[in-house]
């Protein structure tokens, strides 16, 4: 028994020594939990700090790039290109003022021709007829043939009626009234010429038609086509007369001649005073319905 116990103790001692030898040879196997992985983790945290340091410089580099893009705002040359366009529009406005010379022509007519009430012109219609019939050969030497064909009795009647009505008009308005009478005579002559021109147009158009068709058209169209032609011819004439801007330069010169002759003839014939200037003040005869009143 003693021997057995001795051998058992020896075996225990041997196993313990063997275990100590093994642990001494492999020291990491004694306490694996005592390993310190913390220092490598601590080393990772300082490695994360350079990352924001690397990210910050690109942001700082992008900011100057934006700042460099912002000064690319030279829009001033565009505004300078728009500004020279405005002075170019001023010559267009100057051309518009130069283009319509008819407006200046109309203003001259309005200044020369007064507007008279129709009732006043009807009152002085005998004076108008007296001038149209050329009762006084000295007044219109170009129309002596027409004046010779008229009876002296009608001229005498027109003269008496004219001399009865002309003194009733205020002296301040006589010049304007006489000028309006001569203007109405020219417009009436222009209207008659316009009607004659329109009546000749259908005759020229019908020259190519056969004689049989012409005879039938004459029989059927004398009652139907002549009247509409006259009506159609009168409507544009009234528009022209109302506008009063269709007088040609030679007609204006003829108007001045007729007015000067009428201003010499009517005052001496009726023994009235007519001032040789247009009345600038407002008179009851200077308010009318338009140039159409002169007909």
Curated annotation (Swiss-Prot):
SMART domains: AAI. Belongs to the gliadin/glutenin family. Glutenins are high-molecular weight seed storage proteins of wheat endosperm. Thought to be responsible for the visco-elastic property of wheat dough. Residues 41-61 have a biased composition (Low complexity). PANTHER family: PROLAMIN PPROL 14P. Disulfide-bridge linked aggregates. Gene3D superfamilies: Plant lipid-transfer and hydrophobic proteins (1.10.110.10). Pfam families: Gliadin. Coiled coil: none annotated. Keywords: Disulfide bond, Repeat, Seed storage protein, Signal, Storage protein. InterPro entries: Bifun_inhib/LTP/seed_sf (IPR036312), Bifunc_inhib/LTP/seed_store (IPR016140), Glia_glutenin (IPR001954). This is Glutenin, low molecular weight subunit PTDUCD1. Residues 30-61 are annotated as: Disordered. Residues 1-20 form the signal peptide. The keyword Signal applies. GO terms for molecular function: nutrient reservoir activity.
